[in-house]
Regions:
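Noncatalytic modules at the cell exterior or secretory-pathway interfaces
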Residues: 31-33, 88-102
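Beta-strand-rich, repetitive solenoid scaffolds
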Residues: 47-48, 60-64, 85, 98-100, ...
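Short, surface-exposed beta-strand/strand-loop-strand elements in extracellular ectodomains
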Residues: 40-61, 109
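Local beta-strand/beta-hairpin segments that build beta-sheet-rich folds
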Residues: 8, 22-25, 54-74
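Exposed aromatic-hydrophobic patches
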Residues: 79-87
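C-terminal interaction-tip segments
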Residues: 1-27, 99-115
Length: 115
């Protein structure tokens, strides 16, 4: 039997209250986190086992925007993406995500897959 995952849909710093989003409540398995940056500044997603932005951090993804848009030694890069395979990490209270852009805004986002 195949596993069926649910997705948070695209999350950005504009999602929820300033990038703070309750993705799921109650016991769930965290399968993966995907993120991308196409332009702008670096971006970060912090995922908590909770229903708020506190408690146990189960993942922290930071995608650096250096070398994008022809800046830096590798001028051909037009975007970056990253995936964390979380292998079904058990989140007892739920999944809460906080997305931030430390130095401004840009074209970026995250998705969280869970079951």
């Amino acid at each position: 039997m195949s596993q069926t995952s649910r997705s948070s849909g695209e999350l950005t710093e504009s999602s929820g209250a300033s990038g703070s989003v309750a993705v799921a409540t109650g016991p769930v398995k965290l399968n993966s986190v995907h993120g991308y940056v196409v332009s702008g500044t670096s971006t970060q997603c912090v995922i908590y086992d909770n229903t708020a932005a506190s408690g146990t951090i189960v993942a922290r993804m930071l995608i650096d925007s250096s070398d994008i848009d022809g800046v830096g030694p590798i001028a051909a890069i037009t975007g970056k993406s990253m995936e964390f395979d979380m292998h079904g990490v058990y989140c007892k209270k739920g999944i809460f995500a906080v997305i931030t852009t430390p130095t401004g805004s840009g074209n970026h986002g995250f998705t969280i897959e869970y079951e």
